Each structure stands twice: as C-alpha cells, then as structure tokens.
C-alpha cells in the first residue's frame, strides 16, 4: 500500500504532463527540411508527391509551350494558366508563407 501511495503522485504527474494528441501539433509555419519532415510524419509509408516548378516545366510540354508563348491558342491557354495559378496554392504557400494543419499536409500524401 505504501508503494502505491508513493507512485500515485508520479502517475498523476505523468498523466497531466502527456500532451493531448490533438494539441501535439498545432497549426504552424513549416519551411524547408521541417516541411519535409512533417510530410514524412503525416504520410508515412504512403509517401508524398513533390514536383518543383523548374522540373515541371521541363517535363510538361504544354507548360513549356505556354512559357515560350507557342502552340495553338497560346493566348487562351496563357490566360487560363494565369487564372489557375492565381487560384491554386502550393504547399509552400500553404505551410511556409501561411500556417497549415495536419489535415492540409495530408492533401499532399500519395
């Protein structure tokens, strides 16, 4: 009984000290390696997708045509691309420039 009485304050302290899982990750700014580590943590074995703008332009011929100003209906495509670019936010805009949550990070998992 005396052992239990000695351990009770310690157990109470441990229970109170343990962070609540919902509060363990508050919305925060994540940039660079911290962003990558958070993605690994959230996505786990599923992994995540990442396509830098410089590589995306090389791999996607339509984007390359838009940047060079060529191709059929280039003016219409350029206008559409600008509208989409203004609406679409990347992970850096969401999590580094602004703050993001675990749920927003999960959108980038495979």
Curated annotation (Swiss-Prot):
Belongs to the insulin family. Disulfide bonds join 31-96, 43-109, 95-100. It holds the Pfam family Insulin. Residues 1-24 form the signal peptide. Residues 57-87 form a propeptide. Insulin decreases blood glucose concentration. It increases cell permeability to monosaccharides, amino acids and fatty acids. It accelerates glycolysis, the pentose phosphate cycle, and glycogen synthesis in liver. PROSITE patterns: INSULIN (PS00262). Heterodimer of a B chain and an A chain linked by two disulfide bonds. It comes from Cricetulus longicaudatus (Long-tailed dwarf hamster). This is Insulin. Gene3D superfamilies: Insulin-like.
């Amino acid at each position: 009984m005396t052992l239990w009485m000695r351990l009770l304050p310690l157990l109470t302290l441990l229970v109170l000290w343990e962070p609540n899982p919902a509060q363990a990750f508050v919305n925060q700014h994540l940039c660079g390696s911290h962003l990558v580590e958070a993605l690994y943590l959230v996505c786990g074995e599923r992994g995540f997708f990442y396509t830098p703008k410089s590589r995306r332009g090389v791999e996607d011929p339509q984007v390359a045509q838009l940047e060079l100003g060529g191709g059929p209906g280039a003016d219409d495509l350029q206008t559409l691309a600008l509208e989409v670019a203004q609406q679409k936010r990347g992970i850096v805009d969401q999590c580094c420039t602004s703050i993001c949550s675990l749920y927003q990070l999960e959108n980038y998992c495979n």
